[in-house]
Amino acid sequence: MNPFFEPYNTPHDTVPFDRIRLEDFEEAFMEGIRRDNEQIEKTINNPEKPTFDNTIINTEEDKGYYDLLSRVSTVFFNLLSAETNDEMDALAQKMQPILTQHANDVRLNPRLFERIRQVHLHHRKLTPEEKMLLDNCYEGFVRSGALLDEAGKERLRQLTEEASMLSLQFSQNLLKEQKAFTLDITDEAQLDGLPETAREAAALTAKEQGKQGWVFTLDMPSYSPFMTYSTQRELRKQLYMARNTICTHDNAENNIEICKRLINLRREIAQLLGYKTYADYVLKRRMASNTRGVYRLLNDLIDAYKPTAQKEREELKKLFDKSLTSNPSPLTSKMMPWDSGFYSHKLQMKKYNIDQEMLRPYFELSKVIEGVFGLANKLYGITFKENKDIPVYHPDVKAYEVFDKDGSYLAVFYADFHPRKGKQGGAWMTEYQGQQWEIKDEKLRIKNVRPHVGVVMNLTKPTEDKPALLTLGEVETFLHEFGHSLHGMFANTRFESLSGTNVWWDFVELPSQFMENYSVEKDFLRTFAFHYQTGEPLPDELIDRIVKSRNFMAATACLRQVSFGLLDMAYYTQREEFTEDIIPFEKQAWKKAILGEQLPDTCMTVQFSHIMAGGYAAGYYSYKWAEVLDADAFSVFKKHGIFNQETAQRFRDEVLSKGGTEHPMTLYKRFRGGEPTIDALLKRNGIKAPKSHKPSKSH
């Protein structure tokens, strides 16, 4: 029998990956749609007066874990990012329009919406969480076109179905292009400057691909060390241009027209729903409220960070010019983008005598896992135990049971660490089962259904004779995604659609970026950073250098993120049809946050998954917004102790466990005692506030 049609009978009802076949998905999708439609018919044909219980609860259950369509969709689309193949891609192309049509059928059903509207108008005696669910349900239908006339609804169907297909095509094109390129080296002299770990990894990749020598790819664990350490400027340029021109070539994977069409589709959707721009539509349900709030934040950051970033660039350029004088290059004498990583490393060594390779031996993955889990234990008292009886979708994946401080079961946690064929680049948190209370009609809390969450990353792989040795940056990435996972694990709400990370998108990055702070905390590093061969702890002098170098090129990094935010807003504040050429438009859109050379052929937009296919359209500013929040929140821990359990418990109770049950600023203020200011972020980064700056609330 199709495993989606029967009880899983696995530990904690985890997904039976070992029993799922490709053909099971389509069958389960179609049966899920049939059951959904059947349930909706029951709801709208109910002769009783619409109530919260017989209408809103039913609608909530139609998209929860116990709903077949939700279950199969969750598994399929998670695997499409983490473990796909040509057959999965083809099925996605087939199912996407069917699923989008079904979603439209639900949200544009006039009889269902009328019942929801009646409850919204006449509800009584709801708890705050029930009221939030009702408001979200009503708003969700309105924002999906429920108030449009028939012609408007039909047009909206066309737009959303096309947008969903193009988003999928964008992602599939990007993955194909990223995996297609390799830099093959057979002359060992061309490896000059590369550390042993990078050489060994490249040799292993070559062996896996049946090639001689060394193979470098566009996956970050391969790309980043090459750009940082290789003395071969020509090869750095080749690799840089390969990465930064993907999906711009004259082939089937070109994303330029897809991006233009997505921008226009989203603008038209927003205008059809009564908004001037897509950004206005998105920001209606964000802490930032409107485009003014977003631009105010981005411009404040430019004012604060740009002077320091200019100094950082001048310092880098001096080192480049000095190096070029003693070692002339056949390429241009200007510092180019493919030089930045190489000379940043040299400058960091000169100023702090520290680099990522120096630290790798102390960041063996198994020890890092112990450290991250240990941090969660110190803060919240939770423990992790690997359970090999829990099915996984790839041998690389580990599954853990998570137990609360009282020993009770809390969650299942999956960890998928390394790059491989069929896996998207980057890092993300995922969820296979959301938390909710399983209740009966009398509203008794019967069972707290616990979440199944995980992290999917592309960290350095082990080699034939070495374990996986991470960079400090990869440790930070792990902490970031683990922070999202804690948000999911600690969820304690009645309704799944309000639990865990189901919050406004400019709040969702707070728990993740908060955890990044620990990557440069001495007392945390001392808990797990031991040499993988000798067992010696990371020397105090190295830890001191890590802490001192924390803000190295911080202003440049900030402007880079701001530039992405500006680009995002430039696309989604369009009021008329977007017809411009993507590449030159991009260069102009982020110009005031870019200090270096802009190359005419490179393009970020065509690989900018966040804003084209990842849900961050008109929302990329969220990363900097959340950074203001996380710096402010972590200052409380710095004051009371970074492992202070009382503070951690308040953070868990007031923020992490609440999900989207209240307005995010209400939750934050309850924890912090007031609204955040940008000041803590400036202080953390060692940035002097501009003269015009006054301590201000986050926007």
Predicted regions and their residues:
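His/Asp/Glu-rich acidic catalytic environments and adjacent acidic regulatory segments
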Residues: 1-31, 35-36, 81, 88-289, ...
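C-terminal, non-catalytic "cap/extension" segments appended to globular domains
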Residues: 1-21, 27, 31, 213-215, ...
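Short, charged/polar, low-complexity loop and linker segments
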Residues: 5-13, 42-46, 139-144, 352-354, ...
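Membrane-entry segments of alpha-helical transmembrane domains in multi-pass membrane proteins
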Residues: 17-28, 52-59, 251-255, 294-298, ...
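C-terminal non-catalytic alpha-helical accessory regions
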Residues: 33-125, 559-571, 575-591, 598, ...
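Short, hydrophobic/amphipathic alpha-helical patches that form generic packing surfaces
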Residues: 67-75, 135, 139, 340-348, ...
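Active-site-proximal, well-structured secondary-structure segments within enzyme catalytic domains
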Residues: 129, 133-134, 172, 176-217, ...
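Short pre-active-site segment immediately N-terminal to the catalytic Zn-binding motif
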Residues: 460-479
